[in-house]
């Protein structure tokens, strides 16, 4: 995904007008754009293709929703040291992101693992109950996908993960610190990075 501010101006075909207006006030639009971090949601081939699909749907005027994961470190930042490329984590959410809207009212519990138990109901139907599972709370964030020169705005909904319980005090009191923060670590692991280096055996 590209940076939101310049993208909106270009798609509404007002970029040059905004740039000229700011220049009259002694403000450089490019300097403002540089303050916005790139959404580090991953930049692989499939991710880029999905972004192009979303932009095309908006430009063609088709109403659409896209879904993805709100990776905290989806890409890396690079710099040159002693003539060599050095990769660093890109914490693009460190200072917040202005083109996303948190929607906690649409959170869902997502369950992992466990087992399913069948229960016979009085009306003869069978009810299936999942037990012994781990779960996280999925929280959506809306990002606008603006069509080109047509006043159409679709939505990319990216999902973050939060623990159902941030801290298990009972486990902590028993000296089991790892168990106390297990839920927190599970949520964090799901959204921390897009994928690890594939040079190592999983």
Q: How should each PLM-predicted stretch be described?
A:
Residues 1-9:
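Single conserved hydrophobic/aromatic residue that forms the stacking wall/gate
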Residues 36, 50-53, 58-63, 69, ...:
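Short, well-ordered loop/turn elements at secondary-structure boundaries
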Residues 10-14, 167:
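Beta-propeller domains
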């Amino acid at each position: 995904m590209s940076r939101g501010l310049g993208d909106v101006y270009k798609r509404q075909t007002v970029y040059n007008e905004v740039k000229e207006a700011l220049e009259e006030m002694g403000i450089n639009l490019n300097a403002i754009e540089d303050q916005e971090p790139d959404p580090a949601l991953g930049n692989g081939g499939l991710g880029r293709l999905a972004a192009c699909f979303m932009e095309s749907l908006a430009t063609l005027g088709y109403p659409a929703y896209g879904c993805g994961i709100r990776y905290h470190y989806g890409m890396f930042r690079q710099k040159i040291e002693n003539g060599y490329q050095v990769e660093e984590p890109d914490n693009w959410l460190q200072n917040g992101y202005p083109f996303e809207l948190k929607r906690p009212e649409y959170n869902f519990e997502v369950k992992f693992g466990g087992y399913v138990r069948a229960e016979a109901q009085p009306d003869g139907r069978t009810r299936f109950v999942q037990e012994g599972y781990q779960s996280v709370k999925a929280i959506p964030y809306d990002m606008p996908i603006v069509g080109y020169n047509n006043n159409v705005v679709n939505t990319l909904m990216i999902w973050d993960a939060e623990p159902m319980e941030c801290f298990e005090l009972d486990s902590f009191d028993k000296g089991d610190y790892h168990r106390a923060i297990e839920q927190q670590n599970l949520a964090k692991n799901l959204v921390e990075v897009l994928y690890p280096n594939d040079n190592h055996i999983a």
